[in-house]
Amino acid sequence: MNTFGELFRLTTFGESHGPAMGALIDGCPAGVALSAAQVQTALDRRRPGQSAITTARAEADQVELLSGVYEGKTLGTPIAAVVRNQDARSQDYSALAREDRPGHADAVWRARFQHRDPRGGGRTSGRETLSRVIGGAVAEALLARELPAVRTVAWVAQVGPLAVTAPAQLTRAQVDAHPTRCPGPEATEIERLILAAKEQGDSLGGAIAVRIEGLPVGLGEPVFGKLKARLADAVAGIGAVTGVTWGGDEVLARLREPGSRFHAPRADGVPSEVYGGIQGGLSNGAPLSLRVYFKPPATLAAHATRGRHDPCILPRAVPVVEAMVSLVLADLHLLWLARPHRP
């Protein structure tokens, strides 16, 4: 499956070392303010080569909007966008046409399809996620018009053994202020940890936290399209994701409590944070929080003497997680509008 969503649909295409990566967004209503500059801003946050802790692959990731937008507004027709690959070094992967890399999808894709592109991982490369960021930028443009109070912010909450102490209120500008996208006092230490792993030819995993504010009450499509299920499906489809939790680590710690304490109502009447912003599969109006866990990258520089790789994908995965969340919210909003909800 290369298409995500029901009414607001994203189809991604392209291989890591092919001519281009691309996205086709269908179902976006007409009249939504959208420019190439908006999409480019999103792509720049995911772009490789941002700092010493990311891959050295030098890609400008300049987006071209081919259709669906005229005079700064969507037409209601399919929106096609491409990013040309400019710095692929396919010769680095010539040996992989005959052998499979440990920890990668090479062997299973060969078994499944009987034919694959070994250059840079082909379709399984993390480079595919730039197409998701394009789709997420369009989704955010729609949300800005339809649900202007919605704000989604993600940040690196843990790298290896180091957890981040983030403030209660965050903006993307605060998150992006440090190359690690760790908005806490641990940022410098985490940067040193990633650089040490890079120097040793090793890699690191960790977690990304997400907070969504301004959601209306009732967003979701029970029973199989619950908000929690749709978000989990969206972020679990990102390569290297190994788990999702709701409400943060503090909520996991409270699972040991008896129900009388766990479900105790707050004095101010606001839904308890233990629900993570979701009850009965629907948004409850409180901030929605989740945490997405990533395994360490499988390509280790200590073993792979050729090719270019991130020692830790978390800083560049932040905008990818935000994009997948926005795609879900945009799709569920259109479903809300399309289906009757009152007798």
What are these regions (language model features)?
Residues 1-343:
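Generic N-terminal targeting/processing segments that precede catalytic cores or assembly contacts
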